[in-house]
Amino acid sequence: MTTTQLPVFVKMYELNLMLMRLVNKFPKQYKYNLGNEIIKTSLRLFKHLFSANRERDNKVKRGQHLEEFLDDYDLLKVLIRITNEERLISIKDTANLALLTESISKQINGWKNKSDKVEDK
């Protein structure tokens, strides 16, 4: 299965589009620092997905890429939390982001756990 066909990729793509739309509405003092960091981090997550999916035969490397994904993903969730606390996004948008991030977390953790189990054998 190609990376772009993965359900987690579809959710990440949806999250990325939503974040780009929201960042575009940020006040100037947030758009070019916090907003840029959010976009850079969310785009970097795609790189980790592509890298992990490419390592079909090497479960150790796949696990490493998924760990890197989770590290950057944790950063993204903190950045999203800051936008919420600074009231840069609405409660509705915060709820939608929470649903997407939860879905993505479950999928990535499931993928990582599967890779870890194969690694342990």
Descriptions of predicted regions:
Residues M1-K121:
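Amphipathic alpha-helical assembly/interaction segments
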